[in-house]
Amino acid sequence: MRVGLVANAYNEARFLPKFLKHIPDWVEEKLVLITDPPWYGDKLEDDGSKVLAENAGAIVLKFPWPNEHDQRNAGQSYFADYDWVLTIEPDEFLSNDDWRKLHDFLLTADKPAYAVKQHVLWGKGYESDPPEDFVPIIVTRPTVEFTEKRNVNSNWTTLPDDIKIWHFAWARSDEEIWKKISHYSHAVDFDIKDWYENVWLARKTENVHPTTPEAIPRLIKAKLPPELEALNLWPK
């Protein structure tokens, strides 16, 4: 079974080296795609992601992809000869146990695409309760195409409930959050300045998701698996 991994990266220098090093050896090759310039917003100063990724053993491609799905599809093409493509972002982590379960599941998996349930992490030490309903597609056959953001052109289902990711989407400093929301693919879907000032900086704890507030109804203390806690992934 040949498995490759694709990660889209822009301004993810804090997460990227730790993310790449936590990927198990059964993933044959790691590909990091860096869009330059970003999909939205002004170009940021180079944060060194390319060098960091290469030092962690990844192949890096830089290109001015106009949107998220075109960038993801570049990864699909790169791994055309593989059995599976894992499309996981630099702020999405699996525990050792979840990696093992994912490997064993893929040995007999028969669907073209799989999404995963997630712990959505916030600030320093918190997560959404209950978990966000959105399930990102992270496993596909290389023939599957992304059509918009993380949507695909094939049927898909969800991985077994005991396989989850720990998504550090909102586990960032004030500066990191502003850079994220002003450049990512949802930057045109909400008033970023209003949300940043009146939700994020106001330190609200209920109904805080930027595009669908009720998707993160409240925050509770998070308890990471020990191996992820040891990576020091929370912001300072």
Where are these regions (language model features)?
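Active-site beta-to-alpha loop of glycosyltransferases that engages the nucleotide-sugar donor
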Residues: 2-21, 36-37
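Active-site acidic Asp-centered loop
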Residues: 35, 88-89
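Short, acidic/glycine-rich phosphate-metal binding loop used to engage nucleotide
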Residues: 62-68
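Short aromatic/hydrophobic "clamp" motif used to bind/position activated sugar donors
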Residues: 85
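Polar, enzyme-active/binding microenvironments
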Residues: 1, 80
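Acidic donor-binding segment of Leloir-type glycosyltransferases
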Residues: 21-62
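Catalytic-site signature of metal-activated, phosphate-bearing donor transferases
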Residues: 68-76, 93-236
